Amino acid sequence: MMRVLAAMSGGVDSAVAAARAVDAGHDVVGVHLALSATPGTLRTGSRGCCSKEDAGDARRAADVLGIPFYVWDFADRFKEDVIDDFVAAYAAGETPNPCLRCNEKIKFSALADRAVALGFDAVVTGHYARLSDGVLRRAVDADKDQSYVLAVLTAEQLARAMFPVGDTPKPQIRAEAAERGLAVANKPDSHDICFIPSGDTRAFLGARIGIRPGAVVDADGQVLAEHEGVHGFTIGQRKGLGLPGPAADGKPRYVTDIDPASGTVRVGSAEDLQVRQVRAERAVWTSGRTPEGPIDCVAQVRAHGGTAPATAEAVDGGLVVRLHEPLTGVAKGQAVVLYRPDPLGDEVLGSGTISGTARTHALDGAAGASAR
């Protein structure tokens, strides 16, 4: 038996995860993270994130399970490590993943550190992933798999984590919650960013960054439009570009490059989005050991995004990932996650924060091509 802290967001997944920890014979205490100093500024129902309504749902679930329950205030830490980081990344022309950062800095760092200090052996959450003997794998339910946003965790962090729902499809989790008498059994999922209640990311960023005008240009550098800040754009974006009309060839145009220093947003064709090589910094290897030499793997560059077979190599604390097939919409600030295919469930090898890419024609030696 272990003494386990159950992080209860107020959703069905974390409630069932806590219940399964109780069933396993562990001494379980529930905790809900208060992540906002201002009531009403977090979106209710956001998976893994917490409004006042979610705190009430979590408390009621703990009552049904018969476990102690507390609310811990992590608002200041959340603002500093997640919200401020999110804003700064967009201002720098990057596209961050706040859920990944929350896992890295809050749930499995600040929360886990406090748990260990209080004598707990592990933190249990409702994440959809599988963890056994230190090996992190994709969840059984591919549509709900969250291994991508957990790939930033170190071996030490994984050693004190538990993911009890990763071996079960979501519909069965809901059915189990109903059988247990948990009122959150049919609570809707939310895939929005919890600290942007309106869902309007551009407005949220604009209020904090302000107006930083720049130009939208084509591949030849011709100015097509003006904009109010690079924070309103991400690589692969097609809508909301403010362009006066379609391209001369009639094909859609996408954001292909963002230069925060000059405020320039470059647009081009879908072909211009293709990437064959990814550079990343701050590599994390889930085994705790940095591999020597190239490794064959499968790379994923967005949560629930497509994958490509690849060869990866550790370089100067980061990664160089050579894709055997092109991927599109690869943005700086996102994570590149490396998997090893396995019939038992694809194994997470490691991750890094994308710092640059090279396009297909650049690697093929085409004249005038450039890396970004």
From Swiss-Prot:
The keyword Transferase applies. Its main location: cytoplasm. Residues 144-146 are annotated as: Interaction with tRNA. It catalyses: S-sulfanyl-L-cysteinyl-[protein] + uridine(34) in tRNA + AH2 + ATP = 2-thiouridine(34) in tRNA + L-cysteinyl-[protein] + A + AMP + diphosphate + H(+). One of its GO terms (cellular component) is cytoplasm. Disulfide bonds join 102-194. It is found in: Cytoplasm. Pfam families: tRNA_Me_trans (PF03054), tRNA_Me_trans_C (PF20258), tRNA_Me_trans_M (PF20259). One of its GO terms (biological process) is tRNA wobble position uridine thiolation. The record marks 127, 334 as: Interaction with tRNA. Belongs to the MnmA/TRMU family. Catalyzes the 2-thiolation of uridine at the wobble position (U34) of tRNA, leading to the formation of s(2)U34. This is tRNA-specific 2-thiouridylase MnmA. It comes from Nocardia farcinica (strain IFM 10152). The lineage of its organism: Bacteria, Bacillati, Actinomycetota, Actinomycetes, Mycobacteriales. The gene is mnmA.
